[in-house]
Amino acid sequence: MRFSVYQVSRKGGREKNEDRMGYCYTRDAGLFALADGMGGHPEGEVASQLALQTLAAMFQRDCKPTLPDPLRFLHEAIVAGHHQLLRYATQKALIDTPRTTIVACLMQGNAAYWAHCGDSRLYMVRGDKLVARTRDHSYSELQQTMSQVVPMGDRFNRNVLFTCLGSPGKPVVDTVGPLLMQAGDRLLLCSDGLWGTVSDSEITDQLSSLPLSDSVPELVEQALRNGGPKCDNVSVLAMEWEGVEGDSTMGIQTTSLGEAVFASTIQASVLGTDVSPDELDDAEIERSIKEINEAIKRSSQHKKG
């Protein structure tokens, strides 16, 4: 595989940044993911980090160096992250469960597969056209697609999500794929801090007209400017697909990797490759969360410095 990646996360006017993102890959498959911890619930930064760690751990365990069923993997790994959040809340005796949205894209062969829960989005741009976008799990999006079937009153809060990881009910996970990729196709994963103040057409224009190293920072800065002093955190992870074989001209090429090689930018945890996250004992969960909290503390101290 050959691809290039650029990612930026900026704290807006919120007390802390609860967005997390990263990617990992083997010789023949790549996983890109972003999660947005939800405000109004405890420890959103733990929720987003734990969801990504679970996803990455299962990818490392199962991808040898490909996955037999990418869509099934995405669905099961995202639901496993949900179960981890419920177990964490029980272990900590929390009154409420930490919650997060998530969007993840898997590249395998020459095809893309993706899944999401909540309102973190994926955009796919080919040339200067928006080819695909995820649909938010919000009542606003639901009204747009089902307005004739499910009318909603004016007082209804359309921005409320009807599903996320960590919620009491089973999460809704939408999956898409396979979608055959062409060289030059670009995928963008983002939190609602971006699309909440920057339109789909603006995202498409920037992504199609500039290199990722220019378009991603500009989109983030535009979102912060448009959002003002109380704007949400803005996180963006973008990937440009170059193809399956050959040398990468801009970023990462995996063809020379061994079958057992696994690389990741997602913070490592105690989630072993030979253990299902749903089968971890309480001591392992405790150690995992301790690692997360220590990393968050170090990150906070670094930003203050």
Feature locations, PLM:
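PP2C/PPM-type serine/threonine phosphatase catalytic domain
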Residues: M1-G305
